[in-house]
């Protein structure tokens, strides 16, 4: 196990005390809101640090007592009984704090942009893309997050060739960031008379929703085209004469939005463009920091096949962590917490291993 960063722990305690003092002094409302946010973030960490320090002090007292030959036998027996319990408590607290003190991803608390595109498999791939979108939509509803479709292109037999949506809520990106990659489906299409299993795929990209403060887009770096647009209709598609296409000239990234209002289109297209540029910048920085990033669960490589959904067997397999569950129906209804948590745990374990190698 990696050693706990004692200096960092002391700094967090010092900062927490400073925030408490400033909040008690009655600052301006906007300052108070910022302090309260930082307070709620630090409180669980500092609570564990203080519990750990208390347990360490108890251990020292017990060891001193056991070394003191003048202490009567009954007291020594009690101390010997307590000693393993305190050591066990310290070990558990150390494990919890290893996770709490891991470097935080600055984007984890952000909302997210969800992009799903049908891949190989024609109409069946579009239907599967629709199934995936509904899965994330239901998971989001359970979490109390708001889902808003920015653009959608329906498949001929249903589903989506492409759908882009915002998922708004605290910590959305932290929960969904490991969903990026190729999702493969194996099932018998409804139109298949012979009952043969077909394999098709859809690509998922989850980007942290960027704000203007996160990334600067210069007016001279974009070209905005207005065009006529029409869709097949349906729940998530609007027919409009005011579709907007924004091209970011330096990167070549193109974003299209087709809401009824041209003003809305421009705002939504800029929202997606900003998030894609922010994500590209994050990935560049991550690649520089970690040469072996591709081997990690959180690599975000969208060409990597990450998961298989086998409908005849009712099985879902995440290939990155060799996790197989036989509860496909429930997962397609949005019950993906078990997989999401397993991916996060695996990622944290790899971070801890790297931390241990560095010390």
UniProtKB/Swiss-Prot annotation:
Residue numbers spanned by region Disordered: 280-306
Compartment annotation: Cytoplasm
Keyword Transmembrane helix: no
Transmembrane segments: none
Keyword tags: Cytoplasm, Methylation, Protein biosynthesis
Principal location: cytoplasm
Lineage of producing organism: Bacteria, Pseudomonadati, Pseudomonadota, Alphaproteobacteria, Hyphomicrobiales
PROSITE patterns: RF_PROK_I (PS00745)
Record family assignment: Belongs to the prokaryotic/mitochondrial release factor family.
The organism's place on the tree of life at top rank: Bacteria
Function: Peptide chain release factor 1 directs the termination of translation in response to the peptide chain termination codons UAG and UAA.
Molecular function, one GO term: translation release factor activity, codon specific
HAMAP family with a match to the protein in the record: Rel_fac_1
Record note on modification: Methylated by PrmC. Methylation increases the termination efficiency of RF1.
Residues bearing PTM N5-methylglutamine: 235
Organism: Rhizobium leguminosarum bv. trifolii (strain WSM2304)
SUPFAM superfamilies: Release factor
Protein name: Peptide chain release factor 1
Leader peptide range in chain numbering: none
A Gene Ontology term for the protein's cellular component: cytoplasm
Keyword S-adenosyl-L-methionine included in the entry's annotation: no
């Amino acid at each position: 196990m990696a050693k706990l960063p004692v200096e960092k722990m002391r700094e967090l305690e010092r900062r927490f005390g400073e925030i408490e003092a400033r909040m008690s002094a009655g600052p301006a409302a906007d300052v108070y809101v910022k302090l309260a946010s930082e307070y709620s973030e630090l409180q669980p960490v500092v609570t564990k640090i203080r519990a750990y320090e208390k347990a360490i002090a108890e251990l020292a007292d017990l060891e001193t007592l056991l070394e003191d030959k003048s202490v009567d036998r009954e007291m020594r027996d009690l101390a010997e009984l307590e000693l393993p319990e305190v050591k066990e408590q310290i070990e558990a607290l150390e494990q919890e704090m290893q996770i709490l003190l891991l470097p935080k991803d600055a984007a984890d608390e952000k909302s997210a942009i969800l992009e799903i595109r049908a891949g190989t498999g024609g109409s069946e791939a579009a239907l599967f893309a629709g199934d995936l979108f509904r899965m994330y939509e239901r998971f989001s509803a359970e979490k109390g997050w708001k889902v808003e479709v920015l653009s959608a292109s329906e498949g001929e037999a249903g589903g989506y060739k492409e759908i882009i949506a915002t998922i708004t809520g605290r910590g959305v990106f932290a929960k969904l960031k490991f969903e990026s990659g190729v999702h493969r489906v194996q099932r018998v299409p409804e139109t298949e008379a012979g009952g043969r299993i077909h394999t098709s795929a859809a690509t998922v990209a989850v980007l942290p929703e960027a704000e203007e403060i996160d990334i600067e887009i210069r007016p001279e770096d974009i070209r905005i085209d207005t065009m006529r647009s029409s869709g097949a209709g349906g729940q998530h598609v609007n027919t409009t004469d005011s579709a907007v296409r924004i091209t970011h000239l330096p990167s070549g990234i193109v974003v299209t939005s087709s809401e009824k209002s041209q003003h809305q289109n421009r705002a939504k297209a800029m929202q997606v463009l900003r998030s894609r540029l922010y994500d590209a910048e994050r990935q560049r920085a991550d690649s520089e920091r970690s040469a072996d990033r591709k081997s990690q669960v959180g690599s975000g490589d969208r060409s990597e096949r990450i998961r298989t959904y086998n409908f005849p067997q009712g099985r879902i397999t995440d290939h990155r962590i060799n996790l197989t569950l036989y509860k496909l129906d429930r997962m397609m209804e949005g019950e993906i917490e078990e997989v999401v948590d397993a991916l996060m745990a695996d990622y944290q374990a790899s971070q801890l291993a790297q931390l241990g190698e560095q010390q």
